[in-house]
């Protein structure tokens, strides 16, 4: 991707501030347009971010060393776009959609000015023709399909085509590369169009054709604390703020491995390179618990680590959501994981500072909240013209400095998401993983999930509320115990405290390194939760706090052992019987 003869508009550099250049332009340009800056016989990709008269300000996505006043700049005439088509899955891209495995063949380090196609032009795909000559199609309608892994990848009329098209020619089913013309059409104005398997779309514009509908399906992630206390629906939005070391990245890795969705798009925008390397090493060897295939078969990774240019962080998060929206249009369920949106916000702050804009709180731009809201609004469930439904669930990790949830990025995020999974440093230090604090977390989807599960598990919603009440009461009693000791509280309060601790240790906490406990399917969660509710509704007889504590510790040990056993195995059934017998030995009555 370099300047071509079609790029007639040119300019020259007037001034440079880091990766921000002020350029005098001879011709017509528009905000968001892609430009190329000439330096050392290479072309550096850039984007127009401000237009003032005959001058523009552009942010360069590469190291700007060597750029001098008067350097030639050419403008492409098109916006910053994503290349969309078969072959994106299993791909590893940078923020500009360069395939990193191809760049790795040329050099150990990323050389500036090197750009490669996101979709391989040599790969042959088995194309099945669906459209017929004479049919009238519009944007998003299916021309044909190719098999991409286990998915039928729909080749659609480009979304940049806003007119109805009458198909005049179609190719027969067979094996073709992505640049092969698979159909031709004519618009109402007589314009002739050719369609290939690849289309492009500006990454900063929402990619949508169809009707947005309310979310009505639970996204099972295999984490009991999320599925029970802070559930999320497919097409919902949630965030995972937390201080450094609280386990945000590990939580996102778990979601990418076990979430019950079709495709996961992982945006590592600004996180440490070591964490990205860990993903690249682990994922090809991990199995998807839902299909048994490699996790990479359903994953697309955009790597933009903190060591890469700041400007590319912004493009990486928009690139990720554009790819996710593209697959949603095929009727698939997508999960987008952005780690971390704080780094993206810091990139916005840096660019805003160089543009000399009036700063908002903590020097972030005044439009930060609207940018974050616009990003999360691109999620949701969509009903297509053919009646199929797809969804895009967005999870954004937030890294507030010092774990301060009052800072602007966290507050702007909380105002637009449907669920808040707050990670606590205190819980992480106490080794209570996942360190999601149920006392500060919340979900707007609780009632919707309760309504869905009511048919399968009567009283689910009330049971979850009861568990939350026990947690709140237990936390209050725990604070009193720290002040007056166990002797200063009643036996009834002691029992409530121990029940809340048991629920925390045995239900909310999970061992990510245990083969069984790392992923808890919904049927298993329902059975364990019914056991917890049986304990909540039971009264026990104890002589003193020590006896009560020893009983609940024994109970905790047996339930922890049960969590590590294969579900419905002989050992599991025996362990469950032992637990119920132990409960009966101390039980006074059931409420």
From Swiss-Prot:
Its EC number is 7.1.2.2. GO terms for molecular function: ATP binding; proton-transporting ATP synthase activity, rotational mechanism; proton-transporting ATPase activity, rotational mechanism. One of its GO terms (biological process) is proton motive force-driven plasma membrane ATP synthesis. Keywords: ATP synthesis, ATP-binding, Hydrogen ion transport, Ion transport, Nucleotide-binding, Translocase, Transport. This is V-type ATP synthase alpha chain. The keyword Transmembrane helix does not apply. It holds the Pfam family ATP-synt_ab_Xtn. ATP binds at residues 242-249. It catalyses: ATP + H2O + 4 H(+)(in) = ADP + phosphate + 5 H(+)(out). Gene3D superfamilies: 2.30.30.650, 2.40.50.100, Bovine Mitochondrial F1-atpase, Atp Synthase Beta Chain, Chain D, domain 3, P-loop containing nucleotide triphosphate hydrolases. Produces ATP from ADP in the presence of a proton gradient across the membrane. The V-type alpha chain is a catalytic subunit. It comes from the Bacteria. Belongs to the ATPase alpha/beta chains family. It is an enzyme of class 7 (translocase).
């Amino acid at each position: 991707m370099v300047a071509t003869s079609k790029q007639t508009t040119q300019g020259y550099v007037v001034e440079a501030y880091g990766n921000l250049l002020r350029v005098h332009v001879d011709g017509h340009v528009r905000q968001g347009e892609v430009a190329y800056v000439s330096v050392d016989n290479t072309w550096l990709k850039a984007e127009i971010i401000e237009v003032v008269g005959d001058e523009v300000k552009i942010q360069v996505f590469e190291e700007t060393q060597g750029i001098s006043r008067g350097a030639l700049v050419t403008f492409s005439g098109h916006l910053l776009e994503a290349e969309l088509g078969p072959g994106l899955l299993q791909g590893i891209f940078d923020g500009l959609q360069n395939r990193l495995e191809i760049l790795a063949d040329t050099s150990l380090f990323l050389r500036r000015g090197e750009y490669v196609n996101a979709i391989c032009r040599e790969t042959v795909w088995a194309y099945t023709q669906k459209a017929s000559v004479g049919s009238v199609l519009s944007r998003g309608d299916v021309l044909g399909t190719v098999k991409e892994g286990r998915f039928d990848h729909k080749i659609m009329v480009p979304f940049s085509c806003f007119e109805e098209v009458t198909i005049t020619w179609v190719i027969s089913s067979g094996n073709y590369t992505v640049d092969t013309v698979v159909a031709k059409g004519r618009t109402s104005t007589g314009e002739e169009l050719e369609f290939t398997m690849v289309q492009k779309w500006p990454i900063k514009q929402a990619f949508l054709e169809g009707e947005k509908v309310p979310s009505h399906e639970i996204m099972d992630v295999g984490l009991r604390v999320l599925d029970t206390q802070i559930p999320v629906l497919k097409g919902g939005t949630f965030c995972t703020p937390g201080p450094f070391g609280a386990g945000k990245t590990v939580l996102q890795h778990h979601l990418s491995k076990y979430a019950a969705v079709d495709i996961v798009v992982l945006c590592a925008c600004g996180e440490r390179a070591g964490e990205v390397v860990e993903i690249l090493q682990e994922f090809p060897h991990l199995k998807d618990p839902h299909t048994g295939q490699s996790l990479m078969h359903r994953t697309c990774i955009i790597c933009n680590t903190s060591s890469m240019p700041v400007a590319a962080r912004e493009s990486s998060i928009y690139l990720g959501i554009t790819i996710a929206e593209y697959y949603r249009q095929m009727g698939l369920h997508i999960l987008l994981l952005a780690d971390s949106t704080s780094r993206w916000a810091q990139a916005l702050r840096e660019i805003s500072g160089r543009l000399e804009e009036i700063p908002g709180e903590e020097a972030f731009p005044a439009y930060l909240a609207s940018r974050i809201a616009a990003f999360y609004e691109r999620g949701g469930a969509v009903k297509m013209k053919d009646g199929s439904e797809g969804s895009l669930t967005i999870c954004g990790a937030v890294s507030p400095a010092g774990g301060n949830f009052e800072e602007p990025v966290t507050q702007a995020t909380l105002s637009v998401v449907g669920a808040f999974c707050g990670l606590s440093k205190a819980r992480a230090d106490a080794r209570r993983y996942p360190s999601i604090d149920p006392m500060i977390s919340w979900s707007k989807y609780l009632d919707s999930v309760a309504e869905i599960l009511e048919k399968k598990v009567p009283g689910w919603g009330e049971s979850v509320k009861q568990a939350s009440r026990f947690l709140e009461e237990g936390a209050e009693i725990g604070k009193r115990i720290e002040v007056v000791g166990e002797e200063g509280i009643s036996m009834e309060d002691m029992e409530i405290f121990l029940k809340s601790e048991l629920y925390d240790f045995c239900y909310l906490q999970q061992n990510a390194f245990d083969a069984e406990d790392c992923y808890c399917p919904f049927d298993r969660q329902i059975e364990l939760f019914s056991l917890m509710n049986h304990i909540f509704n039971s009264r026990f007889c104890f002589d003193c706090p020590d006896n009560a504590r020893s009983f609940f510790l024994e109970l905790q040990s047996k339930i922890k052992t049960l969590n590590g056993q294969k579900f419905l195995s002989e050992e599991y059934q025996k362990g469950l019987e032992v637990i119920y017998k132990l409960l009966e030995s101390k039980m006074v009555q059931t409420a």
